[in-house]
Amino acid sequence: MPISKGIFLSLLSTLPLALAGHRSHRCVVPSSNGTRDDSPAIAKVFAQCATDSIIVFQEGVDYNVFQPIKAENLSNVEIRMHGNLHLPQNISAVQEIVKAGNSYWFTLEGPRVDWTGSEDINHGWINSYGQAWWDANPPNGTGIENRPHLLSYTTSDATIKYMRSRKPIAHNCRLHGDDITVTHAIVDAYSTGGFPFNTDGFDVAGTNIRISDSVMYNGDDAIAVGSGSHDIVFERNTIGYQSHGMSIGSLGKDPTDFANITNLRFEDVTVIDALYAARFKSWTGGQGLVKNVTWKNIRVFNVTFPIFVTQSYWDQGANRGDVDESSSVMMEDFTWSDFTGSINTYQPGDGSCASDPCWYNAGLPNLQHTEAIILECNTATSCKNFVTENIQLYPQSMDAPHLICMNATAELNPRLGFDCRNGMYTALSERH
């Protein structure tokens, strides 16, 4: 039966979209089988197959990546990471490369850049050999100089599946862009010696980014949501070791940079042995607005600070000089609901302490480490519409849970769920 002109034109109009999604080139990355540096071969494949291609790192094959890889003009490319990558283990040589201006070992940029790792847990790993770097950190140091971050990934309309990172030296992945889905990732920065400073899992900025069904064991934020982020979801994940949790910020360090974040949801997450679980951090003197944020169904086991907000963030390595103490990044419509589990009473903190007092205890002189909730609002107007519901957290000592609360006024926070004060935590719904 002949089709109408209207239907024909409609089908014709979709042809460019169909063609845009087709990846017509399959490019297999060659390997030296461990005999030399494979970086030149990898860079050549990325250059030759930068558009409408599938780039294959073969399963069961090892690749030595001894020089940084920059692929900044990609478009509609799938990276099939079925082999295992190995970064160099010569610390001084890598430091010289970083000093020359290479902050990230891998830089991937362009629309529709997908990452597909192997479903076999033995394949698809990036091995950074961070343990030697962490062990080289001197006493009271916060990480040796010129550490490379692993991956800068800037894309849109992309899917990242089965990305696996073993012992990243510093930040694991800077993920910027729009409409990105991450599933079944593993970040393993578990240390057998020195503390793994700054081993962030995913530093995120963009719109409509979802990270789910993943595992992150590290020594900094599992996820850190930065300014300019909207519609971010972090769900069904397990995070821990000495993690700094599900974090927003830090924001407002530069008083001239207006922070803007909306619509974040952290849900159905298990947090094990971490310093923080749900965390917001902004600097005194900052400006901006963070609105509509929810942490829900969070299970914590041996966590020092399960719910933590500070608008007076402090960095043990920073000196900001004079700032406007009355200025804050504003927080509005925040909800914490259905938190269960144990507070780390007996061995609170983590291995990142390099100052006295420890950076995470600064400004909290009367800590008992039975605190279920700490809310440090900078002013009486900087926190609005805070809600807590069904907070079932208990100290390991079996003492009553406590709270520290500053400036979350009842007038601006009628559903806060407790009286904002320092002392024993009792939900208003539990009172008779």
From Swiss-Prot:
<dbReference type="Pfam" id="PF00295">
    <property type="entry name" value="Glyco_hydro_28"/>
</dbReference>
<dbReference type="GO" id="GO:0045490">
    <property type="term" value="P:pectin catabolic process"/>
</dbReference>
<keyword id="KW-0378">Hydrolase</keyword>
<keyword id="KW-0325">Glycoprotein</keyword>
<feature type="repeat" description="PbH1 2">
    <location>
        <begin position="229"/>
        <end position="250"/>
    </location>
</feature>
<feature type="glycosylation site" description="N-linked (GlcNAc...) asparagine">
    <location>
        <position position="73"/>
    </location>
</feature>
<dbReference type="InterPro" id="IPR012334">
    <property type="entry name" value="Pectin_lyas_fold"/>
</dbReference>
<dbReference type="GO" id="GO:0004650">
    <property type="term" value="F:polygalacturonase activity"/>
</dbReference>
<feature type="repeat" description="PbH1 1">
    <location>
        <begin position="206"/>
        <end position="227"/>
    </location>
</feature>
<dbReference type="GO" id="GO:0071555">
    <property type="term" value="P:cell wall organization"/>
</dbReference>
<keyword id="KW-0961">Cell wall biogenesis/degradation</keyword>
<feature type="glycosylation site" description="N-linked (GlcNAc...) asparagine">
    <location>
        <position position="90"/>
    </location>
</feature>
<feature type="active site" description="Proton donor">
    <location>
        <position position="220"/>
    </location>
</feature>
<feature type="glycosylation site" description="N-linked (GlcNAc...) asparagine">
    <location>
        <position position="33"/>
    </location>
</feature>
<keyword id="KW-0732">Signal</keyword>
<feature type="glycosylation site" description="N-linked (GlcNAc...) asparagine">
    <location>
        <position position="292"/>
    </location>
</feature>
<feature type="repeat" description="PbH1 3">
    <location>
        <begin position="261"/>
        <end position="282"/>
    </location>
</feature>
<feature type="active site">
    <location>
        <position position="244"/>
    </location>
</feature>
<feature type="glycosylation site" description="N-linked (GlcNAc...) asparagine">
    <location>
        <position position="302"/>
    </location>
</feature>
<dbReference type="GO" id="GO:0005576">
    <property type="term" value="C:extracellular region"/>
</dbReference>
<feature type="glycosylation site" description="N-linked (GlcNAc...) asparagine">
    <location>
        <position position="140"/>
    </location>
</feature>
<feature type="glycosylation site" description="N-linked (GlcNAc...) asparagine">
    <location>
        <position position="407"/>
    </location>
</feature>
<comment type="function">
    <text>Specific in hydrolyzing the terminal glycosidic bond of polygalacturonic acid and oligogalacturonates.</text>
</comment>
<keyword id="KW-0964">Secreted</keyword>
<protein>
    <recommendedName>
        <fullName>Probable exopolygalacturonase C</fullName>
        <ecNumber>3.2.1.67</ecNumber>
    </recommendedName>
</protein>
<comment type="similarity">
    <text>Belongs to the glycosyl hydrolase 28 family.</text>
</comment>
<keyword id="KW-0677">Repeat</keyword>
<keyword id="KW-1015">Disulfide bond</keyword>
<feature type="glycosylation site" description="N-linked (GlcNAc...) asparagine">
    <location>
        <position position="260"/>
    </location>
</feature>
<feature type="disulfide bond">
    <location>
        <begin position="377"/>
        <end position="383"/>
    </location>
</feature>
<dbReference type="InterPro" id="IPR000743">
    <property type="entry name" value="Glyco_hydro_28"/>
</dbReference>
<dbReference type="InterPro" id="IPR011050">
    <property type="entry name" value="Pectin_lyase_fold/virulence"/>
</dbReference>
<keyword id="KW-0326">Glycosidase</keyword>
<feature type="signal peptide">
    <location>
        <begin position="1"/>
        <end position="20"/>
    </location>
</feature>
<dbReference type="GO" id="GO:0047911">
    <property type="term" value="F:galacturan 1,4-alpha-galacturonidase activity"/>
</dbReference>
